[in-house]
């Protein structure tokens, strides 16, 4: 049995100390890191609870429950940030990526502790794939929120649409992982390639301007 709350405390403790030492300018980054790990911890409990209530098998829990719960939980700190502080667009995107990155990091650490780290090649691809899919979902949601929350009539519909897009992408990723075999490695490579393609497109657009 993996006591993920103990892992959470061990990972959050140095972040809290660093947040106190770095001052107010860097405080937001550390708080969103802690929030990302916190919602990952809560997502694990909620996933387990819903899987038990719905009597879902491993595939259903992975493809139907986990993507919905995890993406909704990652959205909560961002919505709170938007409602309370009304930040600028760049800050929204940075916050979304930080939450997603911390979520993926905590998830990977828990996976390593539970399953071992003896298979380097598999762990290498999984680390990049899981990190990239969460960051990609964070980019979709963060970039979209920066646009939709500047327009009152788009706030609710836009947020729901972005959440749906992130859930769909996450569910496809989990489905390929659950299928196994070559599809598993396609899933690991796909988000990395999408992030790289997005950055390349953004770079070319900036060069044209």
Language-model regions, residue ranges each:
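Hydrophobic alpha-helical segments at protein termini of multi-pass membrane proteins
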Residues: 1-209
